[in-house]
């Protein structure tokens, strides 16, 4: 009886952990992200043959230094962030999308470059939904095969 009780207690303690970690494994949905990216297509392109538009093309975004897509005229704020070491990864994209200007300004201040933390990025769109951000990142990862 004592053994069953200990096993039962262990199972009860483990259940929330399993539920949380299995949810994280499925938290990103690239198919849903493709639908979310349609909002981004007002300015951005992705996929074979994508070219810069109002915003830079998004191929190979994961792992790229900010402000470095050839042929795109970035804002000084965006270029300064890249020069200060901003690399696009899941975490930085997730933090950037709800408020691009605030993210870049804070990034530069944290890097000790408050004199460069002025102006604005060209990206006026804000993606505030956490799930949509996770999903669009999963979609972007499909076009960053080396990452």
Question: Regions from the language model: what does each represent?
Answer:
Residues 1-7:
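N-terminal secretory signal peptides that target proteins for export/translocation
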Residues 8-21:
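Bacterial N-terminal signal peptides
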Residues 20-37, 47-49, 147:
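Electrostatic cytochrome c docking/interface patches
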Residues 35, 52-123, 136:
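Extracytoplasmic electron-transfer domains, predominantly the class I c-type cytochrome c fold
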Residues 40-43:
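Short cysteine clusters
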Residues 125-143:
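Short, exposed beta-strand-loop hairpins at the edges of beta-sheets
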């Amino acid at each position: 009886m004592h053994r069953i009780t200990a096993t039962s207690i262990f199972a009860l303690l483990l259940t929330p952990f399993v539920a949380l970690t299995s949810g994280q494994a499925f938290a990103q949905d690239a198919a849903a992200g493709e639908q979310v990216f349609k909002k981004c297509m007002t300015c951005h392109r992705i996929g074979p043959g994508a070219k810069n538009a109002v915003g830079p093309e998004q191929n190979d975004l994961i792992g790229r230094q900010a402000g470095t897509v050839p042929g795109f005229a970035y804002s000084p704020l965006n270029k300064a962030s890249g020069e200060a070491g901003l690399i696009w990864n899941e975490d930085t994209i997730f933090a950037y999308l709800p408020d691009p200007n605030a993210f870049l300004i804070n990034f530069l201040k944290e890097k000790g470059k408050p004199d460069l933390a002025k102006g604005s990025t060209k990206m006026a769109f804000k993606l505030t939904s956490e799930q949509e951000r996770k999903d669009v990142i999963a979609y972007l990862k499909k076009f960053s095969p080396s990452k």
